[in-house]
Every structure is written in structure tokens, then in C-alpha cells.
Amino acid sequence: MAAAEEGCDAGVEADRELEELLESALDDFDKAKPSPAPPPTTSAPDASGPQKKSPGDTAKDALFASQEKFFQELFDSELASQATAEFEKAMKELAEEEPHLVEQFQKLSEAAGRVGSDANSQQEFTSCLKETLSGLAKNATDLQNSGMSEEELTKAMEGLGMDDGDGDGNILPIMQSIMQNLLSKDVLYPSLKEITEKYPEWLQSHQESIPPEQFEKYQEQHSVMGKICEQFEAETPTDSEATHRARFEAVLDLMQQLQDLGHPPKELAGEMPPGLNFDLDTLNLSGPPGANGEQCLIM
């Protein structure tokens, strides 16, 4: 009996020791258990993700998106493709140097996109284009005639916010190129030549139905158009810069005379590329800025 009790006590003691061992092991496990990981925090936006575009970039994108429509409306399809390529190249260079100037050109494109049959929309576009070209012409002429040294010119451009710091001075040639392309032989000559060739027959068939005073103006229009065509036909690849400049000024003077004579007959003006409509106000570079053009002035 005593032996049995001793055996029982030994078993209980062994169970107690096992229980203590297990509890000790559990305590050690709890101490070694790593603390819970902190909840994941919201990561900051990826710096390489989409960024908000600057006003200059926005204007540039909008301008490139609309310029093709602008030239399609202003010129015929073949010339529009060439003008689009030249304009896009020039504007990309300009956008890198002067984003705020791109925004001004965008206003011109937007005005062209709103041109419709009503007089108000046409006036908005013609006024905008006239004042844009007036600003380009005035500043180009002033700089050429100022006699400023290279250093003085650089300082002046810095004062106008036109210095990009690399000293390339590409703004003026770009402005001149755009202006001369708009008033070039490729743009004006084809339509003017076609109207000039059709004018004599039209005058003959309408002489009896038109008031004498108006008929005389149409005759003068025909004569001036012929002189403009002669200026363009006199161009040669070997012409000097002075010759180009003199011819450009002569064409501007003739276009002013043409404007003073009023619009040509609708039957003939219809031969002009869509969007141009022979509105000579768009080419009047010598007149004072109009009230509506102030929003479109570049310089």
C-alpha cells in the first residue's frame, strides 16, 4: 500500500514538473514573440507618376492640337500640310524658350477655329491675325533699324523676358519666319493669280450691270492684283536679302492699296482658300491697332 502511494506521489510530482516546464516554455515564447508589425501607411504619390502640367505646357499642347485645324481652314489641303509642318517646327523651338509666347499664339489659333459665316466671328479672327502680324512686323523692323550692338540687343531682350540664358537669340528669326511664311508667294500667289486671270472676263460680262464707280474700283483691283503677281513672279533663288526685303515691303504696300479698294466680287473671291475669304484686314500691317486686337498682341 505504501509502495502504491509513493508511486502515485511520484507521478503527481512528475506531472507538476512537466506542467511547470511547459508554462516556462510558454513564458519564454511570449517574451521572444516579435511585436505586431505597424499598420501599413499610405505611400506618398510616386514622383514619377503623372504631374500637373505647367500653364506653358498646357498652352503648347493645346496649340499643337489646334494648329492643324487652323491651317486647314486658312489654306488649301496641300499647302496646309506644308504650313503645319513649318509652324510646328518653329513653335516647338519657341515653346522651349518662351512658353508665354506660345499662349499668345494659341489665342490666334482659337480665334481661327471659331471663324464662321457671321460677321462677328470673322472680325474677331481678322483683328487677331492683323494685330499679331502687326506686332511681329513692328518689333522685327525696330530691332533691325535700331543699330544696337549684340550686347545691347541681348540686354534689351533680357528686359523683355526673352532671354533664355543660352545666348542663341533664336526668337527674332522665328518671328520673322512665321510672318514671312504667312505673306509668302506660296500663300498669296496661287489664289491671286487665279482671280487675276478670271477678272477680265468677269468685268466684261458685268460691265452693264455694275455702277460705273464700282466698276472702276474693280478695274483698279485687277490692276493691283496683277502687280502683286508680278512681284512674286520676279522672285529667283539667287535674290539677295535686300531684294527679299524690298519685295516684301512692295507687296505689303500693294495689299494696302487693294484693301482700300474694297472686296473683290463674291464670284471671284470664292476662289480663295476656305477661311481666308480675301479679307485684306488680316494683312493690314500699317494701320494702328484696333480695340479688339489688344488681346492678341504678342509683343
From Swiss-Prot:
GO cellular component, one term: nucleoplasm
Molecular function via GO: ATPase binding; peroxisome membrane class-1 targeting sequence binding; protein carrier chaperone
Region span, Disordered: 1-63
Region of interest called Docking to the peroxisome membrane and binding to PEX3, as start-end residue ranges on this chain: 2-56
Covalent lipidation (S-farnesyl cysteine), chain numbering: 296
Matching Pfam families: Pex19 (PF04614)
Keyword annotations from UniProtKB, A to Z: Acetylation, Cytoplasm, Lipoprotein, Membrane, Methylation, Peroxisome, Peroxisome biogenesis, Phosphoprotein, Prenylation
Modified residues (Cysteine methyl ester): 296
Gene3D superfamilies: Pex19, mPTS binding domain
GO aspect biological process, one term: peroxisome organization
Compositionally biased spans, kind Acidic residues: 16-27
InterPro entries: Pex19, Pex19_C_sf
Location within or outside the cell: Cytoplasm; Peroxisome membrane
Phosphoserine, modified sites: 35, 54, 66
Residue ranges, annotated region (Necessary for PEX19 function on peroxisome biogenesis): 2-91
Keyword Phosphoprotein assigned: yes
Propeptide: 297-299
Family, as annotated: Belongs to the peroxin-19 family.
Protein name: Peroxisomal biogenesis factor 19
Gene that encodes it: PEX19
